[in-house]
Structure formats: structure tokens, C-alpha cells
């Protein structure tokens, strides 16, 4: 059993594992995987290819490709295994790894990190998807 609240939208190929609960107005991007007992606060956006660990409580937006764990949720990595399984090239995975480090490991503000992502986003549509999922966040991103 999984609960999908009112006016919520799930993308294609999503997996919502047992006892996952989405509050109202949640948006889950394509290929996202929400592990068992994941809770998602109303109005949150879960980006495409994102992954949540078991028992995660998500209260802010999760950018595309990001892996979150914990209660409250914290970003831990990117969903590299999911990318490999879906045929992403080693080059794209390497570039996304660098972009994750820009946002989550360099101590930059979100605004400054987005500026740093502009160049690789112009060259790789996957990075642009990651960048746009941060740029469009209304609740703030899980960090």
C-alpha cells in the first residue's frame, strides 16, 4: 500500500515502495524511487531519477538525480546505480558527480552553485535537468 494525496502527480516509471505516503500537491519526477516508509510533505517536488532511503521524511524539494536519507531528509549522494541501470554514459555520470559536489560539498549558496552549473548545463541536458530542478524549487532543496 502507498498513499498518493490529493492533486499529486507521479511521473512515468516511478517506484513507490510499501507504506510510502505523499501528502497533497506533491510532484514526483520520472524514474524516481521512494523506498519503504518514505514520507513526503505537501507541495514537495521530487526530481527525476531521485532516490530516497527507507524511512526518509522529505520536507523540502529533492533535486533530480539526488539520493536522500534520514528524518529529516539529507542529501547523501546521487543515484549513480539508477543512472547506470538506465544506460547513462560514464561521461555524464562523471559530470553529474562534479555538479553534485558543486551544490552539496563546496559550501556555496544555492545562487552561487547555480551560476557554477551554467556551463556544464549548456553542454549536457542531464545537468540542465539537475539545474532546473534546483532553480524551480519553491520550498528550498534538501541539503
Language-model features, listed with the residues they occupy:
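Terminal amphipathic alpha-helical/low-complexity segments used for targeting or macromolecular assembly
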Residues: 71-143
Amino acid at each position: 500500500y502507498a498513499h498518493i494525496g490529493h492533486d499529486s502527480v507521479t511521473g512515468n516509471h516511478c517506484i513507490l515502495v510499501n507504506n510510502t505516503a505523499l501528502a497533497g500537491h506533491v510532484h514526483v519526477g520520472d524514474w524516481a524511487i521512494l523506498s519503504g516508509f518514505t514520507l513526503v510533505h505537501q507541495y514537495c517536488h521530487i526530481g527525476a531519477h531521485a532516490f530516497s532511503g527507507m524511512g526518509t521524511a522529505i520536507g523540502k524539494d529533492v533535486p533530480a538525480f539526488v539520493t536522500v536519507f534520514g528524518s529529516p531528509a539529507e542529501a547523501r549522494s546521487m543515484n549513480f546505480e539508477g543512472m547506470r541501470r538506465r544506460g547513462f554514459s560514464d561521461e555524464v555520470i562523471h559530470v553529474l558527480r562534479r555538479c553534485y559536489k558543486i551544490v552539496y560539498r563546496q559550501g556555496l549558496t544555492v545562487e552561487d552553485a547555480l551560476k557554477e552549473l551554467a556551463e556544464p548545463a549548456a553542454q549536457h541536458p542531464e545537468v540542465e535537468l539537475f539545474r532546473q530542478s534546483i532553480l524551480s524549487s519553491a520550498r528550498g532543496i534538501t541539503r
